[in-house]
Amino acid sequence: MEPLTIVSLAVASFLLFAFWALSPKTSKNLPPGPPKLPIIGNIHQLKSPTPHRVLRNLAKKYGPIMHLQLGQVSTVVVSTPRLAREIMKTNDISFADRPTTTTSQIFFYKAQDIGWAPYGEYWRQMKKICTLELLSAKKVRSFSSIREEELRRISKVLESKAGTPVNFTEMTVEMVNNVICKATLGDSCKDQATLIEVLYDVLKTLSAFNLASYYPGLQFLNVILGKKAKWLKMQKQLDDILEDVLKEHRSKGRNKSDQEDLVDVLLRVKDTGGLDFTVTDEHVKAVVLDMLTAGTDTSSATLEWAMTELMRNPHMMKRAQEEVRSVVKGDTITETDLQSLHYLKLIVKETLRLHAPTPLLVPRECRQACNVDGYDIPAKTKILVNAWACGTDPDSWKDAESFIPERFENCPINYMGADFEFIPFGAGRRICPGLTFGLSMVEYPLANFLYHFDWKLPNGLKPHELDITEITGISTSLKHQLKIVPILKS
């Protein structure tokens, strides 16, 4: 270990002890929670590859609303639909902020995106643009040709590898990346491979453990240990690529409205004005990064889980294939066909319930002191909503941890944010605005995979032997990538 690192850790340890010893002991009526260790509080209890499961297990012991002390950060975790409703509906305005983090400030241009921007007029207007212009149902439909073209390419690859194992995980990640990049940037990104590589480094950074995040007074560690310099270098790489994209869009002129990519839309909004603030290139880049980072990992992980569950349940695979092959006429699936694929939609719903792409929703922050379920929640408290625990709540779902798509037959519950037992995209003001786009990246590819190919496990593996161990980053995915064998449809 370098001498500077040793000295830094020694200084940090001393300061941590000082923070702990001198910090005022609260007398507020906080929610119950597990015992706190000196200095670190409950940080050690989140050091797990599946923190959503750890928190659900703690909630069984300490209650559906639970207080954790994560270093210097007071944190409240809610784990049931009733308490999620309290946070995201009853008191939504009080919990509409995001915590300020060094990484969101660096990567998203001082948090001028939609995901990390603080609640206020800027966020409201940018969210409105996103909802009405960028990710409306009409706009998502306009990208259908991009999805269709990419699925044709993938199908040809699978045909050439029929009868041999393919890495389904890698294939779907590449597919989702290609569609999102083209829908967002058009054909103007000359270095997509570098862009995607840096984006994944950003995603890893956002989900990685960082001691200074739990001790605001230790931000100097990010400088001394070289983390901040590394993050700034990554941000500079992204900024250079996005700057070239904006220049390319401006040089080629404006596309027709039905051919606009998302950068076209944002530049049009920037040029026409009409907002209470001047839209800058930094605002455009921040929102573009939102689009690129938010959907990539989550859509591919959902596809991976859906196919995994179908491989583990051959009777469900058979029913889904029979449906899609009876509905589709000819060699090509149209997105209109999806409206008739009722069982496939049940499969996607059940996948989102049991394998929520973001099991712990993006953290919120309490804007003003309030009371939830009889407990005091001080201002600046960090709020974690365990969407996975809500989706597997035994009081809301029978056989909650079993994969049963049929549970959604004739069931009015949906993922639009009104039913708090099923919130894979969040709810309230901070619900994911890319919901429709994300679903299009799951339903249409899945239908194609089931229509054109039969599938089997490699090396004589039995369905019940398929390893479904989880690992959590930005989203929860399989620890071991899914490898399966495509067989040409007879």
From Swiss-Prot:
Classify the main location.
membrane
Q: Name one GO biological process term.
A: terpenoid biosynthetic process
Listed InterPro entries: Cyt_P450, Cyt_P450_CS, Cyt_P450_E_grp-I, Cyt_P450_sf
Q: Which residues cross the membrane?
A: 3-23
The alphabetized UniProt keywords are: Glycoprotein, Heme, Iron, Membrane, Metal-binding, Monooxygenase, Oxidoreductase, Signal-anchor, Transmembrane, Transmembrane helix
* Locations listed in the record: Membrane
Name the cofactor(s): heme
Q: What is catalyzed by this enzyme? A: germacra-1(10),4,11(13)-trien-12-oate + reduced [NADPH--hemoprotein reductase] + O2 = (+)-costunolide + oxidized [NADPH--hemoprotein reductase] + 2 H2O
Q: Which domain of life is it from?
A: Eukaryota
Instruction: Name the EC number(s).
Output: 1.14.14.150
Top-tier EC class: oxidoreductase
What the record says about family reads: Belongs to the cytochrome P450 family.
Function of the protein: Involved in the biosynthesis of germacrene-derived sesquiterpene lactones. Component of the parthenolide biosynthetic pathway; parthenolide and conjugates are promising anti-cancer drugs highly active against colon cancer cells. Hydroxylates germacrene A acid to 6-alpha-hydroxy-germacrne A acid, a precursor of sesquiterpene lactones that spontaneously undergoes a lactonization which yields costunolide.
Protein name (record):
Costunolide synthase
List the gene name: CYP71BL2
